[in-house]
Amino acid sequence: MAYRGGGRGGRGGEQRPPYSGRGDVPGRGGGGGGGGAPPYRPASGFVWPPPGMTPRPGPPQPQYPRPGPPAVVYGAPMPAAHHQGAYQPGGVYRAPSPGVPVIGGYARSTPVTIRAPPPSHSSAPAPYQPAAAAPAPSSSSTAPSATALAKEFEQKLFVSETALAPPAAVASAAAAPAGEASVESDKDLAPVSKKGLAHPARPGFGAAGKKVMIRANHFLVNVADNNLFHYDVSINPESKSRATNREVLNELIKLHGKTSLGGKLPAYDGRKSLYTAGSLPFESEEFVVKLIDPEKKDKERAEREYKITIRIAGRTDLYHLQQFLLGRQRDMPQETIQVLDVVLRESPSWNYVTVSRSFFSTQFGHRGDIGEGLECWRGYYQSLRPTQMGLSLNIDISATSFFKPVTVIQFVEEFLNIRDTSRPLSDRDRVKIKKALRGVRIETNHQEDQIRRYKITGITPIPMSQLIFPVDDNGTRKTVVQYFWDRYNYRLKYASWPCLQSGSDSRPVYLPMEVCKIVEGQRYSKKLNDKQVTNILRATCQRPQQREQSIHEMVLHNKYTEDRFAQEFGIKVCNDLVSVPARVLPPPMLKYHDSGREKTCAPSVGQWNMINKKMINGGTVDNWTCLSFSRMRPEEVQRFCGDLIQMCNATGMSFNPRPVVDVRSTNPNNIENALRDVHRRTSELLAREGKGGLQLLIVILPEVSGSYGKIKRVCETDLGIVSQCCLPRHASRPNKQYLENVALKINVKVGGRNTVLERAFIRNGIPFVSEVPTIIFGADVTHPPPGEDSASSIAAVVASMDWPEITKYRGLVSAQPHRQEIIEDLFSVGKDPVKVVNGGMIRELLIAFRKKTGRRPERIIFYRDGVSEGQFSHVLLHEMDAIRKACASLEEGYLPPVTFVVVQKRHHTRLFPEVHGRRDMTDKSGNILPGTVVDRQICHPTEFDFYLCSHAGIQGTSRPTHYHVLYDENHFTADALQSLTNNLCYTYARCTRAVSVVPPAYYAHLAAFRARYYVEGESSDGGSTPGSSGQAVAREGPVEVRQLPKIKENVKDVMFYC
């Protein structure tokens, strides 16, 4: 019985790979589920697929039970899309009955007849006016007007848990004057339930493009028919260490496995859950085991007793998993999949270092030195996933940073780049070391017959030659140096350095660095600097053929067929990568200005150039100047500016060759003063001549990093200057490609367009977008690096400001609580004594779209980046609610249809050509061709998702982007959404290459990273906030969110984040 269920992208116009954080410094190079299944349980087992049944060719078709006597509901909110179970007037459907538990993924239902309210004869609502302010309604329970209900029904609002409630209880307040509606509180448009926001079923498979076969790093998994039992495990005394818990359970299995456990071999998750194939011979039992700690000298302290309680928690079989994989059940049986995943992770958890879903070991290859006391370990990622073809094991090659197992003295020398160890450490050095080593385990080596291990909690503020502590109960006090000489006859050499501290502040243990060595196998979880990132990428970069071979060898090395836990649970893993049908979508035709020799362009293998082309809308720069903080000579700076201006004019811009004030060089130690001075001088001069303000400031950065963030913060939030930063190593020897990339960036920063899709100028040329005014959003949240427990997360939302071109994007940013993924400021409600004040980023961007285009958006497409699968429902629930409220606050009944798509780049699916080396199947780097899309076999069994590799690789293995539609009121077909997403990837402003992530999501990521500079500046020691002590602060309660400085309006009007 069986279940069958990268490399970096293009670099155009930027110094780092996509999503690197710095977005301004250009670089070289090119640019309703099915009806309920009967509650049947097989007596002996089942076969997957069932006898005589072929794998499912398409998405499941809903099967509705026979309706009983209908209930009549007027204007009840219903699902938004036909494939989500949209309801039509006059039809009899079944709605969830309140308070009835879900059985097999579906709740019992009550027949409901939906009747539309009588149509309104009033005139259409007036277009919303941004300046209008609606007075607060006198009561939030005011019955909605017929017009509002008709509009709500027409737009097909969400299904909520109040589907059978009276209309007045579920409709939004509509007591605002025409022109702008008010949303007074959460009672008006309450968040819908997670059950109501069911993800849309796949509308079918795509057919566009050239059909090809490729391979994916997914491996089929067969599972025998077993009853799986879940037991709750309680260990006393409790330990937070998974390793300790595993040792305790392992000792229990050794002592009682063949007796009290009935010969079962359980799988343990290291926390609270134990799983078995078949039941244990008891429902609840207590055991006592003793563990000996070899690091403890005292025998009584070395032996520790643990009491283990095991209780039955539940039972599951594979029936619901079978139904889910067949498409007959929409709710994924997460617990069943988790059991099987834990089983397959049990053996490697014992043998390797576990980091999240990856396993690392020195067995997997050479440890590469990445600098500053760190090294790179190789390993593999493993995750069990339900797919259209059945269960598959996704396996990929991984690498991460570990502490080198060296003495602490050696680590400090490398980490701080110290050459003279006789000098004391500065306060800054001490803080950096304290931050890096906090929580690290070390072992002492000053006693030959005994090795003791400790965990570092801090570093002493004074040198150990001055550090005095009591050594006995008589009050005798000694320095650490004196104590080591008297007690161990050990002369300490680094007396001017501080000590490491273990234990608590009340009972500290002082450890001289020179007697301590870092224990092997500890991951470095802090933020890596640019050099370390480059080193780790260089050490792990593999071309597709090499990576595929490495993955295959890893599967063979793991020997899943011989794994005793897999055998216990009847799991078998295929050793070969699966073959997957795919399609290569054609690239779009791009439109350039008619004054160029080439008016249109057909990209070739995901790239093109600006030869014989002019920007479709070249920007104008009349007022500019340049400020150099580098060591470049003045004549070199002037030559670079001249070359850059010449390139801008040649590619279609109108760029005045004369600066407002002379180009000057200045001291990099006075950056802020220099920026204010040039702003004052240019403003005074331009004011006298009546020529407006400074449009562009070209900045040559210093050779030493650390000033970029300050420059951007001052220019964009204080002075209102659009700036273009350039690295001196590029500006001193610019090539044509570099100048072209900078020109592309400057053009969009001053309001121009570089290119647009040719079909944007054809009536209905872009399906779904050209038909009605459409706004495309991109949203992302960036979180502070590990260890910064008090720093805010930053959300960014961008939205297209032109229709039908869809190329200009306005960006907004907002700070929010630490590591909160849901975007708070999509919609907000504030009150004053007179009126309700609505705000938020979505609302502001909708108003800006209206100002720019003269039309209100009639369709919304929302690309949301950075959401993991476990957060799908939570994010959708709150953010769709915010989008709805933002729209409703602008105009009565204004609820345009929304398509909500999650963009995932942080996954481990890799796609490989069927035949490596064939030029008709690969790009120059050996990767699959740009435009390759996959929506079969390795994708979700029922939901609307696909993988798209839209870019051509440069080095390493390309990572496709995963797009998952969480809500779709626009009823996209698979071809329409896949083609739109792929085509948009050719409109990225900063280079003449198709990028790997749809541009709205890419721009939101850049804007969020730009905003982090506003609160952090740019730190060279790993992104800590200025003034931080480097100490991770335990947060006992909510930390006040530090608000971002406001971006000046003239800066927000352009794509400043590019």
From Swiss-Prot:
Top-level taxonomic group: Eukaryota
Region (Disordered): 1-77, 115-147
GO biological process, one term: male meiotic nuclear division
The protein's name in its UniProt record: Protein argonaute MEL1
Disruption phenotype: Arrest of meiosis in male and female germ cells, causing seed sterility.
Domain PAZ: 407-520
Compartment(s) where it occurs, according to its Swiss-Prot or TrEMBL record: Nucleus, Nucleolus
Gene Ontology MF terms: RNA binding; RNA endonuclease activity
Segments of skewed composition (Pro residues): 48-70
Pfam families in the record: ArgoL1, ArgoL2, ArgoMid, ArgoN, PAZ, Piwi
Feature: compositional bias, Gly residues: 1-12, 24-37
Cell membrane listed as a keyword: no
Coiled coil (UniProt feature): none
Keywords recorded for this protein, A-Z: Meiosis, Nucleus, RNA-mediated gene silencing
Upper lineage: Eukaryota, Viridiplantae, Streptophyta, Embryophyta, Tracheophyta
Annotated Low complexity bias: 121-147
Annotated GO CC locations: cytoplasm; nucleolus; nucleolus organizer region; nucleus
